[in-house]
């Protein structure tokens, strides 16, 4: 997939057909129900399930003679579908929300509650921890750790031509914030709770609000921030 720029992401969201994806459980006389091909219909004699856009399903249900039905709604007027993750060569835990047109590298790990927006890229062997947010087009290199609750700002709103870019082998502690357009160099360490508003040089440790360089990465730093390949095995 070609890398999306800011305007392409905005245009994709603005111009996409908006849908309300639903799953509907049906009970009653179903033999006379006929749904369009765009709706996935699994119909038995007296019970069934249909999956599709509520705009297509609702008119049919209004005319049907049903004993009962129940609607599960996944979203309302959604502009970007979720990524089909079946083919991803990665560990993606339940509860992660990953939108379409996201690139996920081999052996990456995406934990529960992580939110990955359209156009983001996650390098091989990188872990996105619980509740972390990768905004639109955020780019994370190989073998990184993005801590729980961390936010990498996106390019959409406020608009930014340059995405957040995280180099390879970067460790970001919990609840850090990296603002739009910022580049974090290879091997850098960002302390928990830091707010990064400027580029971070490679192999440095930054901390604070706003984040400032407090030292160079040394043997002691590397020992404290070592990543575990065992957690990235599939």
UniProtKB/Swiss-Prot annotation:
Record-stated family: Belongs to the transferase hexapeptide repeat family. DapH subfamily.
Kindly report, in one word, the top-level EC class recorded for this enzyme. transferase
Q: Which reaction does it catalyse?
A: (S)-2,3,4,5-tetrahydrodipicolinate + acetyl-CoA + H2O = L-2-acetamido-6-oxoheptanedioate + CoA
> What EC number(s) does the entry state?
2.3.1.89
Any Pfam family the entry gives: Hexapep_2
Keywords carried by this UniProt record: Acyltransferase, Amino-acid biosynthesis, Diaminopimelate biosynthesis, Lysine biosynthesis, Repeat, Transferase
The species is Lacticaseibacillus paracasei (strain ATCC 334 / BCRC 17002 / CCUG 31169 / CIP 107868 / KCTC 3260 / NRRL B-441) (Lactobacillus paracasei)
A single GO BP annotation from the record?
diaminopimelate biosynthetic process
- The answer, when asked if Magnesium is one of the entry's keywords, is no
Instruction: Quote the PANTHER family the UniProt record gives.
Output: 2,3,4,5-TETRAHYDROPYRIDINE-2,6-DICARBOXYLATE N-ACETYLTRANSFERASE, ACETYLTRANSFERASE
Purpose: Catalyzes the transfer of an acetyl group from acetyl-CoA to tetrahydrodipicolinate.
Please state the pathway this protein functions in, per its UniProt record.
Amino-acid biosynthesis; L-lysine biosynthesis via DAP pathway; LL-2,6-diaminopimelate from (S)-tetrahydrodipicolinate (acetylase route): step 1/3
UniProt-recorded name of the protein: 2,3,4,5-tetrahydropyridine-2,6-dicarboxylate N-acetyltransferase
In its UniProt record, a GO molecular function of this protein is: tetrahydrodipicolinate N-acetyltransferase activity
